[in-house]
Amino acid sequence: SNDDTFYISSLSSKVILYKGMVMPKHLSKFYLDLSNKKLETSLCVFHQRFSTNTTPQWSLAQPFRMLAHNGEINTIRGNRNWSQARSSIFKTSKIPELAELKPLVSMKGSDSKSLDNMLEVLVVGGINLFKAIKLLIPPAWKSVPENDSELRAFYEYNAKHMESWDGPAGIVLTDGRFAACVTDRNGLRPARYIITKDRHITVASEIGVYDYEERDVLEKGKLGPGQIIAVDTQEAEILYSHDIDDLLKKRCPY
C-alpha cells in the first residue's frame, strides 16, 4: 500500500506499544490502560520529543517497535542503500518469506525509523539483541588498544558483515526480556542511570525522571562513549558493558 498514514506500531507478543501525538501528561487519558492500577510491567521504554524542524507524523512518533532514539544517524543514506543492496542475501529459517519483504528498512522518513527496522530484522531473524545493537552501533574498538584479543576479534569479524550506523546516539531498546541503553562511539548524547534500593533502575538523558530520595540511591553513574547497560528481567540481573562484552566474545570462536 502507498498509504503513508497507516503504520503498524507493533505485532509483538511480549510488549505493548503506546504512542501518540499528545502532550506527555495526556498519554494516560488517551490510553486508559495506563490509568489502570492492575496494569503492571517489569520494564518500560519511553521517549518524549517535541518536533522542531519536522512536521509531527504518527508513523514517526517514538518509541518505535524496538527502540527509542535521541540523536541523528549521519550515515543514513549509505546505511539505507547498503541494507537494500544486501537484502537479497539475507537468509534465516525464522523468516522464510524474508525475500518478499524488501526493502528491509524504510527508505524515507526518519533515520531512527530505519534504524529500528534494521534492528528488528536482525533480532527477529535470530540474532541476540546485544549483538544486533553492537553490529549497528559499535564502540570505537579500533582505537582502543587495551581491548582483549577475543573482543577485538568479535568486532573485526562482524564489521565485515555490517557497516556501522554512525552519528550522535543515545538509544534505549527492548525485546520484552531485556531493556538496554547504548551510546554512540563518541559519546555525543548523554545517558545517566540511577539504581535505587527498591530495585528500580532508571536510565535517561538527564537525572530526575524518576522520583527518589537520595538516601535510597544504591548507585548512580553515566555511560561513556560506546558503552551499554542492560537489565535482564528473567534473571533479575543488571548487565554492565564488561558483562555484555564477555557474553558476546565467547559466543563464537571469532
Name each model feature, range by range.
Residues 1-254:
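Conserved short alpha-helical segments that host acidic/polar catalytic motifs at enzyme active sites
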